[in-house]
């Protein structure tokens, strides 16, 4: 039995290394005519998807199922996003709005228009930016248990959208939705999970951000 376990983990490690070496994502770039006009990007605080609240941002997600969102989800994802974006500071200047700053600006804009594209344009005008990065949280459920033994796994779902400040149109969008599963159900998930343990919701969200930002368009 011990020899079998050693063989099992050896196979997992080999698969993990081979997946890392064979699946390099090609860097995405904005079209020149668009990229030359974008120097600063306004980063909005994450918004929670709720049946009871109205969103003024167009976010055409395809397969995401909404669920419970932990009270700490917004703060956690805002912090993780800021950390990820620091890797792209040589390409763009990121302007981060606090919740209060965003509410003050958006309330002024909504007095004039509720058109999603026009809202994007006005946000950029008021902040002297050329693009807007918007995030929406659909699900953020903490695991029940420890990293080695769980009752229920962590489950996270969110989307990020980059809008062009000149036209209000979407330049880039990615969504991430994942409920951690045992590696015995899908060995390919070892690349996402990274370790042979049960992740917290924050750890799963951070891995999700790293994954989707592999396609973030540069200039």
Where do the language-model regions lie?
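Short structured motifs
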Residues: 27-28, 118-120, 143-145
């Amino acid at each position: 039995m011990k020899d079998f376990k050693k063989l099992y983990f050896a196979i997992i490690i080999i698969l993990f290394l081979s997946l890392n070496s064979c699946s390099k994502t090609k860097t995405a770039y904005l079209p020149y005519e668009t990229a030359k006009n974008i120097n600063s990007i306004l980063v909005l605080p994450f918004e929670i998807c709720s049946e009871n609240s109205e969103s003024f941002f167009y976010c055409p997600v395809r397969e995401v199922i909404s669920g419970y969102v932990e009270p700490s989800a917004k703060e956690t994802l805002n912090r993780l996003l800021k950390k990820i974006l620091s890797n792209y500071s040589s390409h763009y200047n990121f302007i981060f709005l606090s919740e209060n700053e965003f509410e003050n600006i958006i309330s002024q804009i909504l007095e004039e228009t509720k058109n999603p594209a026009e809202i994007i344009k006005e946000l950029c005008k008021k902040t002297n930016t050329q693009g807007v990065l918007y995030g929406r949280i659909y699900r953020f459920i903490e695991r029940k248990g420890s990293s080695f033994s769980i009752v229920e796994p962590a489950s996270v779902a969110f989307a990020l959208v980059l809008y062009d400040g000149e036209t209000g149109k979407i330049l880039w969008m990615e969504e991430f939705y994942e409920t951690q599963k045992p590696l015995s159900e899908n060995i390919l998930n070892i690349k996402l999970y990274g370790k042979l343990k049960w992740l917290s919701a924050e750890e799963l969200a951070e891995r999700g951000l790293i994954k989707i930002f592999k396609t973030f368009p540069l200039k």
